[in-house]
């Protein structure tokens, strides 16, 4: 990626700078000290992977000599605005109050009752620390896929969105780089793609989005959304892999048209080896059964799915070029996203629109 293209991205999508902020790890010794000081806890500490936050698994001996007790400590990245971190915190508190049956992490208050602790790390940078429950389960990518699992994912997302609809927060409308409403702003990345076939494929999907979705998004039901309901953020029960046992990572939350959240999730459910449209229509129908959608929302789902896939291949490719040491992690969805985009582009949007309306009875 050339410097010129990078400058164009930051000009059109300035909030993307947080995605390229250098890693800001914190020493385990400091984390242990914070746990003792603020939560009165001690135990074995293991650093976990994370896109921006520094994450640590705390394992403590059980008082009753049973299974060890585990908690997750999240330390925010200094480049993340405090308001954004608080939005995520308030979402978890909101869900605990209004939808306690949903399998999301619970916040563990510090000794003074605070669920978020502000502190300066050894490097002098401000951080926010939050201690959460540790969700057990098998990461969905490691589990067998099935139609029942897809239906479970869609139904759970519908219930999550229904619960989040009443959440209000001043950071909900802040600009985020992963906002499908702004998919057209990655065009500079798409136009710079070296492969002419892939470039044309992505350009076509952006054109479809700009002509058939973008002008109509503003009239659709809008609310806080998870905005990253992909299989890497979901856990399943190993004994019943069709059942979702955990929802992770509220770090990309934003207020957006409700259908955007479904589009993000559906983009990761496209079956490239079978019926691509069928998997998306079944997914939409399962969501609709829990949280009814209107015809105007369904009419935009197909171009929105493709727009999300374009964003995945464009943004992750750009980030990998700027952060080659992190490329394997960043590009883990790249190849399959290209395949999904190609499968979707092969189906006329009018056919997809009719199939979605039929599947949902609209």
Regions from the language model: what does each represent?
Residues 125-138:
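Conserved short submotifs of the Hanks-type protein kinase catalytic core
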Residues 19, 192, 312-362:
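ATP/Mg2+ or Mg2+-diphosphate-binding catalytic cores
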Residues 24-37, 168-169, 184-227, 237-239, ...:
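An alpha-helical support segment within catalytic cores of ATP-dependent transferases
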Residues 75-126, 143, 147-151:
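A conserved alpha-helical element in kinase catalytic cores
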Residues 111, 140-200, 220-222, 328-331:
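A cross-family kinase active-site recognition segment
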Residues 51-68, 72-73, 107, 210-260, ...:
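Active-site acidic catalytic loop and adjacent metal/ATP-binding pocket
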Residues 2-41:
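Juxta-kinase regulatory segment immediately upstream of eukaryotic protein kinase catalytic domains
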Residues 258-292, 306-324:
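Active-site activation/catalytic loop segments of kinase-like enzymes and analogous catalytic loops
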């Amino acid at each position: 990626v050339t410097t010129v293209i990078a400058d164009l991205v930051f000009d059109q999508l300035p909030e993307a700078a947080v995605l390229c902020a250098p890693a800001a790890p914190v020493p385990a010794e400091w984390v242990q000290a914070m746990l003792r000081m603020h939560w009165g806890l001690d135990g074995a500490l293991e650093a976990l992977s994370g896109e921006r936050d520094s994450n640590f698994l705390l394992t403590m001996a059980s008082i009753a000599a049973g299974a060890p007790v585990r908690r997750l400590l999240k330390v925010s990245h200094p480049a993340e605005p405090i308001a954004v971190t608080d939005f995520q915190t308030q979402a978890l508190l909101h869900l605990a109050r209004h939808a306690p049956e949903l399998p999301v992490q619970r916040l563990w208050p510090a000794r003074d009752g605070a669920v978020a602790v502000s502190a300066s790390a050894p490097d002098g940078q401000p951080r926010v620390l939050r201690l959460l429950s540790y969700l057990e389960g098998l990461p969905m990518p490691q589990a067998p896929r099935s139609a029942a699992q897809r239906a479970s994912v869609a139904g759970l997302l519908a219930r999550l969105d229904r619960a989040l609809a009443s959440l209000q927060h001043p950071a909900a409308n802040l600009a985020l780089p992963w906002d499908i409403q702004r998919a057209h702003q990655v065009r500079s990345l798409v136009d710079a793609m070296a492969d002419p076939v892939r470039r044309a494929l992505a350009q076509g999907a952006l054109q479809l989005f700009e002509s058939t979705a973008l002008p109509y998004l503003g009239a659709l039901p809008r609310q806080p959304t998870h905005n990253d309901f992909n299989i890497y953020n979901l856990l399943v029960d190993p004994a019943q892999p069709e059942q979702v046992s955990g929802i992770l990572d509220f770090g990309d939350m934003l207020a957006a048209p409700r259908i955007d959240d479904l589009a993000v999730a559906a983009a990761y459910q496209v079956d490239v080896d079978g019926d691509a449209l069928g998997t998306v229509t079944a997914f939409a129908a399962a969501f609709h059964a829990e949280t009814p959608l209107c015809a105007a929302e369904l009419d935009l789902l197909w171009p929105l799915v493709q727009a999300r896939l374009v964003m995945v291949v464009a943004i992750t490719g750009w980030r990998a070029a700027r952060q080659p040491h992190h490329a394997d992690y960043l590009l883990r969805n790249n190849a399959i996203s290209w395949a999904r985009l190609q499968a979707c582009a092969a189906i006329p949007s009018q056919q997809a629109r009719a199939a979605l309306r039929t599947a949902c009875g609209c």
